[in-house]
Amino acid sequence: SDAVANGVHAISGVVDS
């Protein structure tokens, strides 16, 4: 996603764990 997950900026389209 484009949202910050686990303090790491995830790439859009990738599922945030």
UniProtKB/Swiss-Prot annotation:
Signal peptide: none annotated. The keyword Secreted applies. The keyword Transcription regulation does not apply. GO terms for cellular component: extracellular region. Keywords: Secreted. It is found in: Secreted. Expressed in skin glands. Belongs to the Frog skin active peptide (FSAP) family. Septenin subfamily. May act as an antimicrobial peptide. This is Septenin 1b. It comes from Osteopilus septentrionalis.
